[in-house]
From Swiss-Prot:
The entry's keywords: ANK repeat, Repeat
Species of origin: Saccharomyces cerevisiae (strain ATCC 204508 / S288c)
Disulfide bonds: none
InterPro entries: ABTB1, Ankyrin_rpt, Ankyrin_rpt-contain_sf, BTB/POZ_dom, SKP1/BTB/POZ_sf
Taxonomic lineage from the root: Eukaryota, Fungi, Dikarya, Ascomycota, Saccharomycotina
Misc: Present with 195 molecules/cell in log phase SD medium.
Any GO CC annotation of this UniProt entry: cytoplasm
Stored Pfam families: Ank_4, BTB
Protein name, entry field: Ankyrin repeat-containing protein YIL001W
Length: 513
């Protein structure tokens, strides 16, 4: 079943690369689909985007791990089949040793945690052979290695500082790898053996395999290709591991409270090693507490701003850390805006593991919550789910979608609604809501630099042309034609009927546009 879903996602990815739908390409890549696979015609997503001239999509694919090696057949096809010189230059100049996921929001955030010393968010310290200290996040180490997780519970449980007999340069590379920092090209020949030993000791998935291959590869081009292939795999493994951590350690450690119930509970022995509690209240008034981590929640601008400025949450967090120490039983509490628990868990899966699996029935709630959290990428993904779900439009009114797009400023939804209205204009013509929508759109003119056009009307007219596959010049030619049979065959008469309906609505509203 999972393979069929992945095949479907890959087919959809190829289609979106042909059409240039960058938002959907972004969403589909986040499902874990292999960007370097090929379709039944032996076309890769990168080749399709290059061939069709979608430069932004080409750059996105390269940033997410797509490989373009001119020494390979597929890479040569991408370069020489590029529609524009700009795309060709981009492909030629892209160093395959840099073709990693460092610009992917998920990998970027995990990497940033390594250098973020703010607010005492790290909760474990390692002392290596020369006495140098390294700090890290317990939850991340537990997610990345079952052996590390076991040691946290057992032999390291009561240690504030864990001593390891390992060289500092080896442990530095090891930790950076766990934090998805691209350090593969920095590994020196004399470091391979100890890195293999350390990563094998803690059963770090794929790393010993890569290191063994890399140390036996002398050709720089081959080594760069190997790094590119494995860096993509490493990121996908990390996403999978963090998703398992969220499902097994966070969601299974939640505390449910009845409406307005207040009772003391401890998350001290929680396997998630949280440093904040996230409180969520659903529509029925039930409350659920999620053990979370500020280092991850701050990926959302809402929480980042909260702790960048001197809000009470920041003061409480720092005070709790200093007063009760690293192993505090009382941890600060943050509140998520009221929503269903399923929606909160979609948000958490996204923040922790970049998971974008959003069932259509929750897409609107996710969209609204993402807007509050100032998480624009998640807004885009949720809106993409809405516009591509047949079930959604069967359950929701298109005008509700339109008003939602205005409320939270998502152009994709606005265009979707206008296109739907244009396609179904003859069915919606007598619906009073269409007049209300146009009138509301006309009142938004002052927000759009005082123009004499109405945006919704302009969009409907545009999609009416698209509905009948016309260009503006075609309409001018048809207006001078007298052959009714011909005009009927090409669809011009139906087009005029639709345009007449739209003009009648505008006349009823006394709008001259």
């Amino acid at each position: 079943m999972a393979d069929k879903l992945m095949d479907k996602n890959f087919e959809e990815l190829c289609y979106s690369c042909r059409t240039g739908d960058m938002d959907n390409v972004d969403r589909l890549i986040s499902t874990g689909v292999n960007v370097n696979s090929v379709d039944k015609f032996d076309n890769s997503p990168l080749f399709l985007a290059s061939l069709c001239g979608h430069e932004a999509v080409v750059k996105l694919l390269l940033q997410r791990g797509a490989v373009c090696d001119r020494d390979r057949y597929e890479g040569a096809r991408c370069i020489y089949g590029a529609l524009t010189d700009t795309i060709r230059d981009t492909l030629l100049s892209y160093d395959i040793s840099k073709a990693v996921d460092v610009k992917q929001p998920f990998a970027t955030h995990i990497s940033s945690m390594y250098n973020d010393e703010g607010f005492l968010k790290r909760d474990i310290t390692f002392r290596v052979s020369n006495g140098k200290l390294f700090t890290a996040h317990k939850f991340l180490l537990c997610a990345r290695s079952e052996i590390l997780a076991e040691k946290m519970v057992n032999e390291w449980a009561k240690h504030e500082i864990v001593s390891l007999e390992v060289r500092p340069d080896i442990f530095d590379i090891f930790l950076k790898f766990l934090y998805l920092i691209p350090i593969l090209h920095q590994i020196e020949p004399g470091q391979y053996e100890e890195l293999i030993e350390l990563s094998s000791k803690f059963d770090i998935e794929l790393l010993p395999e890569f290191l063994d291959k890399a140390r036996h590869t002398a050709d720089p081009t081959e080594k760069s290709r190997l790094m590119s292939d494995y860096q993509y795999k490493f990121t996908e493994v990390a996403r999978s591991q963090l998703l398992i951590f969220v499902n097994n350690c966070i969601f299974r450690s939640t505390v449910d409270l009845a409406n307005s119930e207040r009772r003391v509970f401890s998350l001290m022995n929680c396997p998630a090693y949280p440093d904040v509690q996230l409180m969520v209240k659903n529509r029925n008034g039930a409350i659920r507490i999620y053990p979370c981590h500020l280092a991850v929640l701050s990926r959302a601008e809402y929480f980042k701003v909260m702790f960048t400025n001197n809000f009470k949450e920041k003061v409480t967090y720092i005070k709790a850390k200093h007063v009760t120490g690293k192993y505090n039983s009382i941890i600060p509490q943050l509140t998520l805006p009221n929503c269903e628990f399923e929606v909160a868990e979609i948000i958490l899966r996204y923040l922790y593991a970049d998971n974008t699996d959003i069932p259509w029935m929750y897409a609107v709630d996710v969209l609204l919550l993402a807007d509050i959290l100032l998480e624009d990428r998640l807004k885009t993904i949720a809106s993409t789910i809405i516009t591509q779900s047949k079930e959604f439009i069967q359950q929701y009114n298109v005008f509700d979608v339109l008003y939602l797009s205005w409320e939270i400023g998502v152009e994709r939804l606005e265009q979707f609604a206008a296109k739907f209205i244009a396609i179904h204009l003859q069915e919606l013509y007598k619906d009073p809501e269409i007049k209300r929508a146009i009138m509301l759109s006309s009142q938004r003119i002052s927000l759009r630099q005082e123009t004499d056009t109405i945006e919704l009307v302009d969009d409907i007219r545009y999609y009416l042309l698209r509905k009948y596959s016309f260009e503006p010049d075609d309409v001018e030619l048809f207006e001078n034609q007298d052959d009714l049979e011909y005009l009927k065959q090409v669809g011009y008469l139906e087009y005029r009927k639709d345009m007449g309906m739209l003009d009648n609505i505008l006349a009823d509203l006394e709008l001259d546009v």
